[in-house]
Amino acid sequence: MAALLASQSCCYGGETARVTKAIGFSSSLENHFTGEATQCYGSKSKRFRIEMRQSELPSKVGINGRSVKMVPASEVVKRKDGVNGSAGKGVNGASLVSSRNINGAASTLVKAPKKTTESYLPPPVEGVRVLPSDEGFSWADENYSSLQRSIDVWSFVISLRIRILFDNSKWAYVGGFTEEKQKSRRRETASWLRESVLQLGPTFIKLGQLSSTRSDLFPREFVDELSKLQDRVPAFSPEKAKRFIEAELGAPISVMYKEFEEQPIAAASLGQVHRAVLHNGEKVVVKVQRPGLKKLFDIDLRNLKLIAEYFQKSESFGTNDWVGIYEECALILYQEIDYINEAKNADRFRRDFRNINWVRVPLVYWDYSAMKVLTLEYVPGVKINNLDALAARGFNRSRIASRAIEAYLIQILKTGFFHADPHPGNLAIDVDESIIYYDFGMMGEIKTFTRKRLLDLFYSVYEKDAKKVMQNLIDLEALQPTGDLSSVRRSVQFFLDNLLSQSPDQQQTLAAIGEDLFAISQDQPFRFPSTFTFVIRAFSTLEGIGYILDPEFSFVKVAAPYAQELLDLKQRQRSGTQLVQEIRKQADDARSSTLSMPYRVQRIEEFVKELDSGDLKLRVRVLESERAARKATILQMATMYTVLGGTLLNIGVTFSNQGSQLVANGSFIGAGIFMLLVLRSMQRVNKLDKFEKMI
C-alpha cells in the first residue's frame, strides 16, 4: 500500500512549514479553545463541538519540522450542544472554528475562501490508474453474487488441480517423462496461477503472497513465481473513496481535512492511499479500505475452508495440517483489513524504536481513524532500492544496508514484535539516512517462551548437537515426533556439518540456508510455523536488499555482535541456576531409567522364552511384488476405461451427426464418466509411486 510513498521525498524540499492556530490534534496547543459545527451529515454526524485542552505530553518533531505534542483521543470531547448549552455556529469545509485565547476572551477566525491560490499539497502522483465505479473486475462490484463468486473460486481450484495432476503424471508427457520437462510445465502452471490469482482479487492475491513464503509446502517453481506477485490493481473512484471515508468517520471530508487529494498516490487490492492536509496544516496520508472487502473475504474463506478440509482428508496432499494452515492465513487476512489493529501495531512499533533515532515510524492520528479508514503522518522518503536517488543525495549505502538488518535483529531478538512484510515498497530512507517503515497490517509476534526456545535452538545449532536441535524443533512444534526419527537426525546433522564447517568466505546466504531447510522438510515430518517462515523470508529479503545496496555486504558481520551477546548470556546462565537445573534433570532421568530397568529385563526374558519354544512367528511378505501387481492391475483398468470412453465418444459423435441427439448425449456422458475413472486410476498410480519413494 505504501509502495509509492517512498518516491515523494522531493515534493516538500523547498516548501516552508506553515504554522496555524487552527485545530491541531498533534500540534502544539498554547490555547484552550473550543470549536463548533452544525454541519448535518446523515444520522451519524449531528451538531458537535470539539474541545481541546493544553497537552502536557513530551514534545516531538512533526513532519513539518516544528515541535508538536501528541494529544490522546481522551483530550477530545464531542458534544451536541454549544459551549453554554446554546446552538453552535455552522461551518463549511473551509471554515475554521471559533476559539478562545489564553486569557479566555472569545475570538472568531475568519472563514477561509473556498478556493486558494496556493495548495498545501504537492503535485498529484502520476501512474495510478483510477477505476471508474461501474467498471473493472467482477470482485470490485459491491453487489456481486455470492453464488457466482463461489463458482469462480471452485472453477479456479478445479482447473489448478487438473493442471497439477497432468504435471505430476508421467504418462501425460509426449515423448517420455524427464525432470526438465516437468520443471518446464510446472513453470507454465505457476505463471498461469499468478495471472489467475490477480484476476480473482484481494483474497487470492494475499494468499499468493503468503504462499510465496512457504517453500516447505509448495514446489519451488510455484514459490518463485508467486514471489513476483505484485499487489497492483486499479484504484477505485475518488467519489466512492470520499463517500466511504465520510460514512466511516461520520463527518464530511471538508470538516475533517483542510485539503484532500482525490488522486490516490498508491493503490492495491485491499485499498488505496490519498494525501490530505489537516486544518492545522499537518500533512497526512489517508488509507481507505476497498468497499465490500469483508463480504468478499467471508465468501472466499468459506470456500477455501472446504478445500482445506478436503486436502486434510486426502492422502495425495501429504500429511500437512491444511486446516491449521488455512486458519493461520484467515487470521492474517482479517487482521490486515482491521485498520484499528494496524494502528495499534504502528503505535507499538513506534514505542519499540523510540530510543533509536535512525528508525522512523509514522504517527497515527487516532481521531481521524476507524476500522476501515486510517490516517497517518505523511513521511516521504527515498525507496530503499532506488540506487540512483540514494546516490544523488549522497547517502551511505553500506550504512543503510547494515541498519536494515540491525533493525530487524532488534525486532526478533529484543522486542519480539516484527514487521512481517519488509519488502522495498515498505522501506524508505529519510534525509538523515533513517529507515522509514510503512504498512503495519502484517506483523508477527514472538512470545517470550517461543523466543526462549528459539535461543535454545540457536545454542544447539552452535554446538552442532543434532539431538538437541530436534528436541528444540519439537518444542517449537516445527517437527512432528512421529515414528522413527533417525533419518531426520541424519538430515539435521548433515545440515549442521555443512553450515558450520565453512570458512567465512564460503558462508551461505540466508536465502540459501532457508532453501536448504525447506528442502529437508520436503522429505521429513517438518511443519514450520508461519512465524518461522515469515522471519526466514524477511531476513532473505533484507539480505537481498543489502547486496543490492552494497556488493560487499555481509550479514555475518552485522549479526556477529548480537550472536556473541547471546553466547555470553548463555555462558553466564550456565554458571548459575541453569547448571543446577540441568544436573537435577539428569538425576531425574537416571532415576526413571533405574526404576524401569526390571520391567525391561522381564520383557527380554519373555521374548527369549517365546523364541526358544517356537511360539514366536515371523511373517514376511514380498511387498515389492505385491505393489507391482497392484500397479499393473490399476493400469489395466485405466486402459480399459480409456478404450470404453473413446468408443462412447465416437458413438456420440456419430449419432450427433445423424440427428439422434438423445443417444449422443448419453454417449457423451458415459465417455465423461470413463475419463474421470481414468484420472482416478492415474491418481492411484501416483500414490503408489510416492509410497515407493518414502520406503
UniProtKB/Swiss-Prot annotation:
This is Protein ACTIVITY OF BC1 COMPLEX KINASE 7, chloroplastic. The active site is at D421. GO terms for biological process: cellular response to oxidative stress; membrane lipid biosynthetic process; regulation of response to reactive oxygen species; response to iron ion starvation; response to oxidative stress. Pfam families: ABC1. It is a multi-pass membrane protein. ATP binds at I265, A266, A267, A268, S269, L270, G271, Q272, V273, K287. The lineage of its organism: Eukaryota, Viridiplantae, Streptophyta, Embryophyta, Tracheophyta. Disruption phenotype: Larger plastoglobules associated with thylakoids characterized by VTE1 accumulation and high tocopherol content. The pale green double mutant atsia1 atosa1 accumulates ferritin and superoxides, exhibits an increased nonphotochemical quenching (NPQ), and have a reduced tolerance to reactive oxygen species (ROS). Lower levels of the highly unsaturated lipid digalactosyldiacylglycerol (DGDG) and of different forms of monogalactosyldiacylglycerol (MGDG) and kaempferol. The abc1k7 abc1k8 double mutant accumulates strong levels of oxylipin-conjugated MGDG and DGDG. It comes from Arabidopsis thaliana. One of its GO terms (cellular component) is plastoglobule. GO terms for molecular function: ATP binding; protein serine kinase activity; protein serine/threonine kinase activity. Induction: Down-regulated in response to iron deprivation. InterPro entries: ABC1_dom, Kinase-like_dom_sf, UbiB_kinase. SUPFAM superfamilies: Protein kinase-like (PK-like) (SSF56112). Belongs to the protein kinase superfamily. ADCK protein kinase family. Its main location: plastid. Residues 259-589 form the Protein kinase domain. Involved in resistance to oxidative stress. Influences responses to reactive oxygen species (ROS) production. Regulates plastoglobules formation in thylakoids. Together with OSA1, regulates iron distribution within the chloroplast and mediates the oxidative stress response. Together with ABC1K8, influences chloroplast lipid synthesis/accumulation and modulates chloroplast membrane composition in response to stress. Mostly expressed in leaves and flowers, and, to a lower extent, in roots. It is found in: Plastid, Chloroplast thylakoid membrane; Plastid, Chloroplast, Plastoglobule. The chain crosses the membrane at residues 633-653, 659-679.
